[in-house]
Amino acid sequence: MSKLLNCLNEKDFSCVPVWFMRQAGRYLPEFRQIRLQNPDFLKLCFDSDLATEITLQPIKRFNLDAAIIFSDILVIPHALQQSIVFKEGLGPKCYDFNINKLLETKEKEYLSVLTPIYSAIKKTKKTLSKDKSLIAFVGAPWTLIIY
């Protein structure tokens, strides 16, 4: 079992598990190399092979105790047919919020859009050493509506 799960299950507190938020990202030269070839951030999140590779980069470099899946909280509104744009230097924006598109989104369509995210989680979990944990995340509704 991983250090993180041992601590969460109150089995072993002898060693504090280490990971940090946004551990995969622009400070890593290997990530910057991938970004040069893949300028569309959202497409990068939906490429399960690249998302898996990016997720594992900091684990290989720093031997952290947990990996955080490479994704973004805005994949959810994107899957709900909202216009999401990532602009260099400005960050993400949700343009022209459309409640009708959101309400009309069928569950099957929504899940289909998110399939690559699930695939990245499965691939990462399969590749990740058993002594490492995998952390996934999602934005709460209030956080998402702020965009």
Task: Please annotate each region the language model reported.
Residues M1-A79:
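N-terminal basic, low-complexity leaders that serve as flexible interaction/assembly modules and, when applicable
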Residues F62, L128-S129:
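A structural signal for short coil/turn segments at secondary-structure junctions
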Residues R26, Q82, A140:
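Gly/Ser/Thr-rich helix-start
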Residues D72-L74, G89, G139:
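Beta-hairpin (beta-strand-turn-beta-strand) motif
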